Structures are given as C-alpha cells and as structure tokens.
C-alpha cells in the first residue's frame, strides 16, 4: 500500500514541511487494505468480490467516523442498505426475501433493544444509525447472518470499550 510505504519512508513526516503525520493514517490504510484483501480472497475473481470490497470500504469509513464522532451518517448507512437490497435482486450475496427479512430483523432487533433500555433507564443506549447499519448488514447477509454479527460486534465492542476506558481512565462515565 503506497501511503503506508511512503509514511515509513518519510519517517512519519510530511515530505514538504516535515510536520509529523499521525500514525492513524497509515494504520487506517493498512487495515483497509487487509480487510479488502480478505474480502476479495473470500470471493475470488468474481463480481461478488468487487461488491464485497466496496462494502468493506464503506464499513471501514463507518467504523472510523463512529469512533471519532459517535455517529453513523445516513449518507453511508442508507445507500449501504439500499445497495444490499438491490444486489439481492441478482442474488449477489443472498436472495431478495432473505435480504428484506434480514434488513427488517436487523433494524427491529436494535430498535427493540433501544426502547427496552430507554424504558428501563430513561437513557438512550445507542443511536438510530446503529439500527440502520444492522439493517444494511442484514440486507447483505440475510437474517441468518444477524446472530453472529450481533455476537461478534458485542464482543468486539465490549473489548474496545474496556480498553478505551482503561486507557483514558474514565471508568463507567465514558460513552462507548
């Protein structure tokens, strides 16, 4: 990946002004390259691989926007959802019925958790972007993929949240 190599070659500094460049940029590039390579490897040389790589790019963008802003913008989640539904008409990842049920189940499952949490605590536990993202993921994987997505994302989110709380020393007051 050129940005990673140039970052190493320039020792993390701008070629013109010599100001330091955050290590985050090459790490995001490296992560994206690895994730896209994995996606392409899973599907081989097919149109499915191209769609999987595009899907991966959008998910990486959503990941880092969410980390920075605690926001999953509609400008990315909704096109991702509609693209998944559109691709299902050609059975690229799943069929149309599975995609529609997956999108509805994804949205409604987190919507239900949101309202149960809000009724129990009086607080919002997540944003609506989370519902839309899980709906989009359901459109790509069908309802069958949702349990593992929820399980893995809960596990990764818990580990990341604990690490952030420890590193930032904020304890339970930190919103994750």
Where are these regions (language model features)?
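Interfacial loop-to-transmembrane junctions
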Residues: 127-129, 163-176
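Hydrophobic, aromatic-rich membrane-embedded alpha-helical segments
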Residues: 2-9, 147-160
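Membrane-proximal soluble regions of multi-pass membrane proteins
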Residues: 1-24, 174-176
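Functional transmembrane core segments of multi-pass inner-membrane proteins
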Residues: 49, 54-57, 61-156
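Select subsegments of transmembrane alpha-helices in polytopic membrane proteins
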Residues: 21-30, 74
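Membrane-embedded alpha-helical segments in integral membrane proteins
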Residues: 30-42, 83-87
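Membrane-embedded alpha-helical segments of multi-pass transporters/permeases
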Residues: 37, 41, 89, 111, ...
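Transmembrane helix-loop-helix
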Residues: 40-51
């Amino acid at each position: 990946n050129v940005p990673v190599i140039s970052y190493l070659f320039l020792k993390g500094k701008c070629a013109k002004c010599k100001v330091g460049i955050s290590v985050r940029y090459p790490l995001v590039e490296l992560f994206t390259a690895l994730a896209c390579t994995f996606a392409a490897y899973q599907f081989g040389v097919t149109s499915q691989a191209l769609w999987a790589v595009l899907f991966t790019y959008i998910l990486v963008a959503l990941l880092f926007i969410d980390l920075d802003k605690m926001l999953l913008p509609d400008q990315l989640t909704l096109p991702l959802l509609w693209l998944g539904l559109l691709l299902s008409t050609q059975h690229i990842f799943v069929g149309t019925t599975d995609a529609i049920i997956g999108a509805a189940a994804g949205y409604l499952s987190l919507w239900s958790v949101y309202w149960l949490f809000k009724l129990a605590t009086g607080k919002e536990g997540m944003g609506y972007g989370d519902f839309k993202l899980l709906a989009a993921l359901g459109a790509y994987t069908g309802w069958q993929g949702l349990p593992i997505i929820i399980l893995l994302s809960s596990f990764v989110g818990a580990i990341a949240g604990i690490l952030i709380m420890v590193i930032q020393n904020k304890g339970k007051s930190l919103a994750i």
